[in-house]
Amino acid sequence: MSKKIKAGIVGATGYTGVELLRLLAAHPDVEVAAVTSRSEAGTAVADYFPSLRGVYGLAFQTPDEAGLEQCDIVFFATPNGIAMKDAPRLLEQGVRVIDLSADFRIRDIPTWEHWYGMTHAAPGLVSQAVYGLSELNREAVAQARLVANPGCYPTCVSLPLVPLLRQCRLKPGMPLIADCKSGVSGAGRKGNVGSLLCEAGDNFKAYGTAGHRHLPEIRQTIAGLQDGIAEGFVFTPHLAPMIRGMHATVYLHLSDGSDPETVLRDYYRDSPFMDILPAGSTPETRSVRGANLCRISIRQAAQSDVWVVLSVIDNLVKGAAGQAVQNMNIMFGLEETHGLDAIPLLP
């Protein structure tokens, strides 16, 4: 592009915010023009995040002072409840918005209010938002003014299911079980006893067993692709003693005669961030660390009619900031891979 895209980031002091800063710094077509934080206003970005020394000369500003309305696109890396209040003004001024919180993901307002425990401040915008699971909604994202970036668990679980659901390959009335594990960074950067090293290190536990906020988001995607499946969906998240990474093990029943590996390969043939592994392989979280990738394998369980899907992503990249940049690329007609060609870190 001859003119760089001017981007703003609202709420850039969390892990998702710094990941956006890292990825956008390497993007050839983007200039980060505004970075906001109410609590850190006046602090240099490079002082707050030493990993960005020599990369950014910006300082955090309050949202009112940052000139966000002068940006071409604004990313909200904020807690739930912020974007729905602040995004409408930017949209009215012609700024495109990608919201990495959950404010615009769930179309049924009462359902959203039940799970997030607050009244929605912009219910009229929810129907206008495009759900930004890039590999599912490319065409809609390309035309969007407002993108609801998916959650990390919904991304990891939905990507291996989308091709199968689109062809109605799952058996209705049968259980669909997602057993998921996340690194501690998925809980965010705020102080939390459960995220302390002495609590999360050398430990493994389930949480949200009575119901997790990502459950209705995943069910919404499933229900939109194949009837009779969402009702049998069960989702249990676990906290693993690692910083980054997400692993989903999904148990499902397929219609007779299905060849799921071929279905997945055909659907994702032209998707640069999707990797369908050879038969017998098992994806590892470290194989996607720091990269905007989803690696998937599928096999039939021994002596059973149950199929087992394994899916891994980096929860901060493909599960958050990387997918947001991918959506931005689609919105502005760029190659999806621009700024997202980093090779996973190993070890």
Curated annotation (Swiss-Prot):
SUPFAM superfamilies: Glyceraldehyde-3-phosphate dehydrogenase-like, C-terminal domain, NAD(P)-binding Rossmann-fold domains. The keyword NADP applies. GO terms for cellular component: cytoplasm. HAMAP family: ArgC_type1 (MF_00150). It comes from Neisseria gonorrhoeae (strain ATCC 700825 / FA 1090). Belongs to the NAGSA dehydrogenase family. Type 1 subfamily. The gene is argC. Disulfide bonds: none annotated. It is found in: Cytoplasm. Signal peptide: none annotated. The active site is at C152. It catalyses: N-acetyl-L-glutamate 5-semialdehyde + phosphate + NADP(+) = N-acetyl-L-glutamyl 5-phosphate + NADPH + H(+). Keywords: Amino-acid biosynthesis, Arginine biosynthesis, Cytoplasm, NADP, Oxidoreductase. It is an enzyme of class 1 (oxidoreductase). InterPro entries: AGPR_AS, AGPR_type-1, NAD(P)-bd_dom_sf, NAGSA_dehydrogenase, Semialdehyde_DH_NAD-bd. One of its GO terms (biological process) is L-arginine biosynthetic process. This is N-acetyl-gamma-glutamyl-phosphate reductase. Catalyzes the NADPH-dependent reduction of N-acetyl-5-glutamyl phosphate to yield N-acetyl-L-glutamate 5-semialdehyde. GO terms for molecular function: N-acetyl-gamma-glutamyl-phosphate reductase activity; NAD binding; NADP+ binding. Its EC number is 1.2.1.38. Pathway: Amino-acid biosynthesis; L-arginine biosynthesis; N(2)-acetyl-L-ornithine from L-glutamate: step 3/4.
